[in-house]
Structures are given as structure tokens and as C-alpha cells.
């Protein structure tokens, strides 16, 4: 089987490039595509959108239509699927899932698709393994890392940035 994995940022891509081969094994293939943020689902699902904007949800209707048209030509013995990985952020899960399925239901043909929604930000995965953070960032701030409560809803990207980035989340936010 082949997997096309869409993720909202570069850090998610780096993590999935390492994790996915361990999950799917050698008999399957995959590509991870990162975007410059999650964005918003467009009101007009048929709109073309600006391809230069690499914003995940803004591009999703066109991406899913393209994957549907491509995957229909894959051999039956080697199917393909799209996996969308993104954060819930401040959205209502029930409404957000319905919006994603509304996009998928406009596709003809419809690609095999799974929506993987992190209730808290994906950075919570990283904060769940403090020794790995310390191995990658030996100068990471212990006080910040030790104050994090695993699986808490607390602004995890800010916590991770405060631990590993010079100037913390305010400095990173200032960069855009």
C-alpha cells in the first residue's frame, strides 16, 4: 500500500519521516508533505485557491480531488490512501470532522482517506519524551520541561519553544 501523508508543519514531517517506516514496514511506501500551517477550510470547496500558499486546509479540497483522480489508476493489489495529520487547535472536534468529511464527499472519485486530529498540538508527542528532547537539544531548559504535565492542554508548542528556542515562544512568534 502507498500512503500520502499531509501534515501542517515541517516539524511534523520530520517526526513522521522517522516514525512511519517503523509503523508500516518495508512492503509499503509513503510520502510526507508538510505545509506552512493548518489554515482554514475554504467556504467555496470548488475554488482553485492559490497554489503558492502552502497552507494545508486551504489546499485540501484540491489536494483530495487530485489524489482521488490519481489513486483510481493505482493497481488494485497496491492501493493508496491519504492521511491528514493536524491539530484541533481551538476548533470543535465534531464540527471540524464534519467539515473534513464534507470536503472528502465532494471528490469523485473519492480517495481512501483518514483524518488524524491531535486534540492538543502535535508537539505534545515530543514533550512526552523529555530524554529525547535533551538528546536533540542538550541546552534545553530543564525547568520548562519538568514543569510540563504529560497530556495536559496547555499550549504545547509554546512550552516546547520556551524550552529549546533562544528567546522562547515570543521570539519564535515574532519571526512569523
Question: Residue spans of the language-model regions?
Answer:
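C-terminal accessory helical subdomains adjacent to catalytic cores in phosphodiester-
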Residues: 2, 13-176
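Helix N-cap/beta->alpha junction signal
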Residues: 8-9
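Conserved SAM-binding loop
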Residues: 5
Amino acid at each position: 500500500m502507498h500512503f500520502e501523508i499531509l501534515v501542517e508543519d515541517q516539524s511534523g514531517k520530520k517526526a513522521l519521516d522517522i516514525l512511519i517506516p517503523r509503523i508500516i514496514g518495508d512492503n509499503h511506501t509513503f510520502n510526507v508533505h508538510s505545509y506552512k500551517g493548518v489554515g482554514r477550510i475554504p467556504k467555496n470547496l470548488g475554488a482553485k485557491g492559490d497554489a503558492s500558499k502552502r497552507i494545508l486546509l486551504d489546499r485540501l479540497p484540491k489536494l483530495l480531488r487530485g489524489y482521488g483522480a490519481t489513486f483510481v489508476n493505482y493497481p488494485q493489489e497496491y492501493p493508496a490512501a491519504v492521511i491528514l495529520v493536524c491539530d484541533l487547535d481551538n476548533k470543535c472536534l465534531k464540527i471540524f470532522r464534519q467539515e473534513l468529511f464534507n470536503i472528502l464527499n465532494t471528490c469523485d472519485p473519492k480517495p481512501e482517506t483518514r483524518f488524524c486530529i491531535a486534540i492538543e498540538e502535535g508537539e505534545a508527542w515530543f514533550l512526552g519524551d523529555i530524554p529525547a528532547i535533551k538528546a536533540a537539544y542538550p541546552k534545553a531548559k530543564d525547568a520548562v520541561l519538568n514543569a510540563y504535565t504529560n497530556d495536559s492542554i496547555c499550549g504545547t508548542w509554546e512550552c516546547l519553544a520556551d524550552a529549546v528556542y533562544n528567546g522562547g515562544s515570543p521570539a519564535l512568534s515574532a519571526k512569523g
